Design a protein with these regions (language model features):
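N-terminal glycine-rich phosphate/pyrophosphate-binding loops that anchor nucleotide-derived ligands
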Residues: 1-62
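A glycine-rich phosphate/pyrophosphate-binding beta-strand-loop-alpha-helix module
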Residues: 47, 51-54, 58-108
């Protein structure tokens, strides 16, 4: 699903659980997790949750005086999550990535 957001500058193809990146200088790296009932509640639309997760990562990198170029995506979802919910989350992630010209490098 994220192949359309992949980056051609990777040292290899888009990863599954990791990405091999050749930094051209200093690199700021950040990781966040968002939990239901802590960072959002069930009233928040799924696409907004996906969008917010990317926005949070961009904000963290910006706070370090750097510019985000790519993201790694990891989702811990219930086994019986609906396709509708999954694609809504993905849609929010994709929208945010397009807004900030980010590439999905891999994830879990």
């Amino acid at each position: 699903l994220f192949l359309s957001l992949g980056r051609s500058g990777l040292a290899g193809d888009i990863g599954d659980d990791a990405a091999v990146i050749r930094p051209s200088g200093r690199m700021a790296v950040s990781i966040d997790s968002y939990s239901d009932g802590v960072h959002f509640n069930r009233l928040v639309p799924d696409d907004s949750i996906g969008y917010r997760t990317v926005t949070g990562a961009v904000s963290d990198i910006s706070a370090m005086g750097s510019a985000a170029e790519s993201v790694l995506i990891s989702m811990g979802l219930p086994r019986k999550v609906s396709e509708e919910k999954f694609f809504a989350l993905y849609g929010g992630i994709k929208k945010a990535c397009k807004k900030w010209s980010l590439k999905v490098e891999g994830g879990d």
